[in-house]
Amino acid sequence: MIAIERYQLIISKFRMWLFLGCSVEERHFKQPVLISVTFSYNEVPSACLSDKLSDACCYLEVTSLIEEIANTKPYALIEHLANELFDSLVISFGDKASKIDLEVEKERPPVPNLLNPIKFTISKELCPSPVLSA
């Protein structure tokens, strides 16, 4: 029997208030946005064995990075916000995970009768760099 192990660190529904919206009027007031990140691992993460924060994706560092990027400027679209967040997460934590998933939700878009948030997701499988032989 073959057993496939998968491990995940999930930071779910981190709420931020951001200047986000297509129109100047919509961006006038901060909008509630929920951000979720999942770090997936194909092998047991080092942090599971070592119990060292240096081997983990520290969720305080992850949420601090999200705050830093999201608060740098107003955004018109959640797609653009998500892409900027995702690029920064891959640069900062891509060496610690096999896959990163990001979900950005605009809780209260100005759409009549819409009961749930608008969501945009990005996902990337991170492959180790090939070893080049001489």
Swiss-Prot record:
Q: Does the keyword Secreted apply?
A: no
Q: In which pathway does it act?
A: Cofactor biosynthesis; tetrahydrofolate biosynthesis; 2-amino-4-hydroxy-6-hydroxymethyl-7,8-dihydropteridine diphosphate from 7,8-dihydroneopterin triphosphate: step 3/4
Q: Does the keyword Lyase apply?
A: yes
SMART domains named in the record = FolB (SM00905)
Q: Which reaction does it catalyse?
A: 7,8-dihydroneopterin = 6-hydroxymethyl-7,8-dihydropterin + glycolaldehyde
The alphabetical list of record keywords is: Folate biosynthesis, Lyase
Catalytic residues at: K106
- Where does the chain bind substrate? E26, Y59, I78, E79
GO MF annotation: an example: dihydroneopterin aldolase activity
Q: InterPro entries under this entry?
A: Dihydroneopterin_aldolase, FolB_dom, GTP-CH-I_C/QueF
- GO biological process assignments: folic acid biosynthetic process; tetrahydrofolate biosynthetic process
Q: Name one GO cellular component term.
A: cytoplasm
Top enzyme class, one word, equals lyase
Family to which this protein belongs: Belongs to the DHNA family.
The record describes the protein's role as:
Catalyzes the conversion of 7,8-dihydroneopterin to 6-hydroxymethyl-7,8-dihydropterin.
Protein's recorded name: Probable dihydroneopterin aldolase
**Where does this protein come from, organism-wise?**
Chlamydia pneumoniae
At the highest ranks, the source species' classification is: Bacteria, Pseudomonadati, Chlamydiota, Chlamydiia, Chlamydiales
Encoding gene, per UniProt annotation: folB
